[in-house]
């Protein structure tokens, strides 16, 4: 199989300073540290106090430029995956572009909820295809604490804020390569995970609707979706790439819930050895979760050049996206 050049030049991650441990949540709702850890694997989460999604993403973009040795004017594209933008418009990517002075970069946002970063990988992969080498920043960033009802323990215990990203290029900079990808949307199940309903309050509305800003989730439906669809998607990309499970060095999964990841690992390999996790530190950060984990593994020298990585995101939409690449 001929692999296409798809190189990660640098990784970066940022989380707000404010940490909310489970013990603090017990003062806000009827719950306990034991209850949260047993059901989710989460011990704490980071939350913003004044920062916005664009601020988190800008910090990541600045780190990416520093670590890659690139100038802002070297960037051709900026793609931000988020479900918690500052505004309906401008896009977070446009705000980042302006903040870092990437004057020639085309900027766009992707909203595929918790699948957003992996959807963004496919968008960037397509953007970079062409005759001349191009370079892009791909960032997943979220301030989900703004979408949480902090009295609803079914959702409040899950989510955190943060951002992570990568510099991607089609130049022959490293040994990186795109291997295979699989993307699916099950819109008929979208009602099982919603957030940020805008409402309808126009004077011309025949049926005014209230604003519903907070997460609403059918946890059982989402759990069953994940443990069924993620292994199926991973098997499809392995087949496309003519790879065995043992050919993958690490499976970088959306950090939705420790129990979900354990079930997926048991299904695919029978072991957590290839499935690193950091949900205990950060909670579910939606589109930020995979790049935050990837950055941790790269900066701690766990992931090395030439490693084969399978990234999979899943969540609202309902959506799932999986890509295998060589780092």
UniProtKB/Swiss-Prot annotation:
Subcellular location: Cytoplasm
One term under GO cellular component: cytoplasm
UniProt KW Transmembrane keyword: no
Main location: cytoplasm
ACP-binding, as annotated region: 255-259
Annotated catalysed reactions: malonyl-[ACP] + acetyl-CoA + H(+) = 3-oxobutanoyl-[ACP] + CO2 + CoA
Name of the top EC class for this enzyme: transferase
Keyword annotations from UniProtKB, A to Z: Acyltransferase, Cytoplasm, Fatty acid biosynthesis, Fatty acid metabolism, Lipid biosynthesis, Lipid metabolism, Multifunctional enzyme, Transferase
EC annotation from Swiss-Prot or TrEMBL: 2.3.1.180
Cross-referenced Gene3D superfamilies: 3.40.47.10
Pfam families, per the entry: ACP_syn_III, ACP_syn_III_C
Pathway: Lipid metabolism; fatty acid biosynthesis
Any one GO molecular function term: beta-ketoacyl-acyl-carrier-protein synthase III activity
Active-site residues, record numbering mapped to chain: 114, 254, 284
UniProt record, GO biological process: fatty acid biosynthetic process; secondary metabolite biosynthetic process
NCBIfam families according to UniProt: fabH, PRK09352.1
Similarity comment text for this entry: Belongs to the thiolase-like superfamily. FabH family.
Subunit structure: Homodimer.
Stated role: Catalyzes the condensation reaction of fatty acid synthesis by the addition to an acyl acceptor of two carbons from malonyl-ACP. Catalyzes the first condensation reaction which initiates fatty acid synthesis and may therefore play a role in governing the total rate of fatty acid production. Possesses both acetoacetyl-ACP synthase and acetyl transacylase activities. Its substrate specificity determines the biosynthesis of branched-chain and/or straight-chain of fatty acids.
Record remark: domains: The last Arg residue of the ACP-binding site is essential for the weak association between ACP/AcpP and FabH.
Listed name of the protein: Beta-ketoacyl-[acyl-carrier-protein] synthase III
Organism: Levilactobacillus brevis (strain ATCC 367 / BCRC 12310 / CIP 105137 / JCM 1170 / LMG 11437 / NCIMB 947 / NCTC 947)
Gene name as annotated: fabH
